[in-house]
Amino acid sequence: MQQIDFYMVDAFTSTTFGGNPAAVCPLDQWLPDQLMQKMAKQHNQSETAFFVANDDGFELRWFTTQSEINLCGHATLAAAHVIFEHLKYPHNTINFTTRFVGPLSVSREGEWLTLDFPVWLSEPVQQPPALLTECLGITGYREVRAARDYLVVLENQQQVEAIRPDTFAMLSLDKMVCVTAPGDGEYDFVSRFFCPGEGVAEDPVTGSAHSMLIPYWADRLGKTQLLAYQKSERGGELRCQLNGDRVLIGGQAKTYLVGKVWLD
């Protein structure tokens, strides 16, 4: 019987029960894709990160309960936390290779981990689908853009907080949905992220969406260093920086659970 270490980590938070939880499984070698998919479904977290050490660092993959995905920020942060804290990685930067988005890295400075991700530039959507505003329950917006996800820009933080989406109706959209606005106080911008098609009605903290949010707000606010907050029930703070064609996304993480997966 094969035993695999299992960790559950709350990412983008300094306290347990905050941020976004992810499952993490270090592997000696890759398991069959079908088996990793079954494991991710059994873990019942929004994402499970699997990684295997290689000569340059680690190969990293992410699975939702339904499928493998191309990028996941909070599960990358969670995997890096496990490598630094539990596997006692001796260096301050972890280099990951991925199947879909090329090389990624995570650096450590004190309690903060910083993701180095590619920029995702969004384009204006001149005629957004009516279903988009209907399922968000809004009648107006500052603008709508699209990249991997729809980006719906509202006027203020209160409007973002007031969203009560129809996530069942949202299943008919062809993209996931990010809602954002300028922050009221200490935060430059706030956001929420809805992805019912991935099995998650509202994602607590979405690192990958900030690959799109950071270049947008850097341009609008005229600054390259930003402080962001995702206004979900659990919530999460992100230190953000635009660095050319890359974004730096900083957060903290806390281990919630350590255990073993037993495979026949």
What feature does the model see in each segment?
Residues 1-71, 77-264:
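Active-site proximal loop and beta-alpha junction motif in alpha/beta enzyme cores
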